[in-house]
A protein has these predicted regions:
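Bacterial N-terminal signal peptides
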Residues: 8-17
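Substrate-binding groove/exosite segments of carbohydrate-active enzymes
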Residues: 137-266, 272-278, 385, 389
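Well-ordered alpha-helical scaffold segments within catalytic/enzyme domains
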Residues: 184-195, 233-249, 295-312, 350-360, ...
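Non-catalytic C-terminal accessory modules of carbohydrate-active enzymes
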Residues: 321, 325, 404-544
């Protein structure tokens, strides 16, 4: 099935998508992840989003025009840049192709796109930037449902995240928090705000405070360090690559992260979880040695993924070796003969399942034990366990339990440990089903997890990714059916996993899925219909 889906995703890229509808236009112009900023660099990187009412539209070339005044640009003259290429598909972080820029210089620019029919589209609306370093915080998401409790949790989370970002942008360098607090909020920052600039600045501040051995501090400017906080130095470059699509910044940080991990291995070569830095602990008493070995497993897993943007295919062998040794040490020390964990806390179960320390055949017993504990005791974790709870339930297919726990238990102190700790990430990626399967959301996986509970009847969400706006909206119908609408940005392909029984009838915009343009059925199971969608907006109806 995976190979079939991969072939289906690649097929339009290889043969070229059929163009449907109107010409393509550039919109959402930005510079180094900022809209009309006072830019931080004399070598700015320019981005735009493709807009078209047609389906399957793609960029084949681009024409960048930049001028020192709005009047010159309006006359279609580029005294700073006039770059025209008929074979340039880059639309995200396009390098500056004009004259050298100076600090304080004001630049007005626009772009037009050459599509697959070799037709130039209209000029974009003009944008501008000034060569000086600022930070601006703008929203990039929306979420609502019929359930007030979920909506209120979303609103509280957004207010908390926005307050931290705005205080940091205003000069309060402690506002984002420790490394642990930042990494727990990283995906939420990216999903809900144009947060690349402040998070990159925070990462640079962490790097400026590295110890001589290469350890990241607990927070910028501090001297202490530990396994929980230091993992921020690895997670932030990964997020820059995967969520913001910035492989150049991720590549730049490879030697820094590598020095840090090699220092950890040198201190604890047998990966026993030996205490390093300041002692760490959790609210439920999970031992620090257990935490150390699991968090090293997580760091190693992310490092293997970072090897792709860093272009380090040979060095990844080191981290495969680390992973095998970490796994063996964990299993020797913490797995009982019957396959259960010797540490019987919910945090211990969550870390074991998320941190690459178990073999696949060892996971189900740990999952069953965790689910049993959650059903009997409710949520019994602190901030570290909360970071992993909803992702683990999502990845193990326990979506109804995740919704039940959020709906029943997130109040008071329990709610507080989830605010800014992955809650809106779960709403957007699980409930709304918006996920990327390529860096920078160049390909999507739309997979809404619709709870069986009758309390939640519909969800509507959008995310303004670096590749354009992604929309997802599902609604349960009274007859047991489902309506699902979505928008896939121009230049992007999506894999859709639509909840539908095998005998259900599925239509898109009133047509069969075989007749609908831009829709390709890959396969159907007893519970799901899998499609590949070209760019465009779609309205599916599922009738039982």
């Amino acid at each position: 099935m995976k190979r079939a889906i991969a072939r289906a995703l690649l097929f339009p890229l290889i043969l070229g998508a059929t163009a449907f509808g109107s010409p393509i236009k550039a919109t959402g112009l930005s510079v180094d992840h900022q809209v009309n900023p006072v830019a931080a660099s004399t070598s700015p990187r320019l981005s735009w989003i493709l807009e078209s009412e047609g389906r399957g539209k793609r960029q084949f070339g681009c024409h960048l025009l930049a001028a020192g005044s709005a009047e010159t640009l309006a006359a279609d003259k580029g005294d700073l840049c006039d770059y025209k290429a008929e074979s340039d598909t880059t639309r995200h972080l396009h390098k500056w192709m004009g004259k050298p820029l100076k600090a304080g210089q004001e630049v007005h620019w626009k772009v037009r796109i050459l599509d697959e029919s070799k037709t130039w589209g209209e000029w974009s609306a003009p944008a501008k930037f000034i060569v000086k370093p600022p930070l601006s915080i703008t929203r990039t998401s929306g979420f609502e449902s019929n359930l007030d409790q979920i909506n209120n949790l979303y609103a509280e989370s957004i207010a908390h995240l926005e307050s931290r970002l705005k205080k940091y942008a205003a000069g309060d360098h402690q506002a984002l928090g420790t490394g642990a607090q930042v990494q727990r909020s990283t995906k939420e920052f990216y999903y809900n705000f144009d947060a690349t600039a402040p998070l990159l600045q925070y990462l640079q501040a962490l790097e400026s405070s590295l110890t001589e051995e290469g350890h990241y501090p607990a927070a910028p400017g501090q001297n202490n360090y530990n396994a929980i906080d230091s993992n921020a130095g690895i997670i932030l470059p990964y997020a820059l690559w995967w969520l913001a699509g910035d492989d150049a910044e991720a590549k730049k940080r490879w030697p820094i992260v590598e020095k840090h991990l090699m220092a950890r291995e040198k201190f604890d070569p047998k990966f026993t979880g030996k205490q390093w830095g300041t002692e760490i602990s959790t609210a439920d008493g999970t031992p620090p040695e257990y935490l150390n070995i699991c968090l090293m497993g997580m760091a190693t897993r992310i490092m293997r993924q970072l090897s792709f943007p860093a272009e380090q295919p040979l060095n990844v062998i080191r981290y495969k070796d680390y992973a095998l040794r970490i796994k063996k040490s964990f299993q020797d020390n913490y797995l009982a003969e019957d396959g259960s964990l010797k540490i019987n806390t919910q945090t211990a179960h969550l870390l074991a399942l998320r941190c690459a320390v178990l073999d696949p055949e060892q996971q189900q017993g740990i999952i069953d034990s965790l689910i049993d504990s959650l059903k009997k005791e409710g949520i019994k974790v602190g901030t570290l366990g909360a970071e992993y709870l909803l992702p683990v339930l999502y990845l193990t297919g326990n979506h109804d339990l995740a919704f039940e726990l959020v709906e029943k238990h997130l109040s008071g102190e329990t709610k507080n440990i989830f605010i800014g700790n992955g809650l809106t990430d779960w709403m957007l990626t699980s409930l709304a089903g918006i996920n990327g399967i390529q860096p920078g959301f160049q390909q999507l996986h739309l997979k809404p997890q619709i709870p069986a509970s009758n309390k939640i009847k519909w969800v509507k969400a959008h995310y303004d990714s670096v590749s354009g706006r992604i929309e997802s909206h599902w609604k349960k119908e009274d007859n047991g059916g489902l309506t699902f609408s979505c928008t896939v940005p121009p230049g992007v392909l999506a894999q859709l996993a639509l909840p539908a029984a095998k005998k259900a009838t599925i239509t898109e915009s009133g047509k069969t899925t075989k007749e609908a343009q831009g829709v390709e059925l890959v396969n159907r199971s007893d519970t799901t219909a899998n499609f590949v969608l070209q760019s465009g907006s779609y309205q599916f109806v599922v009738k039982p």
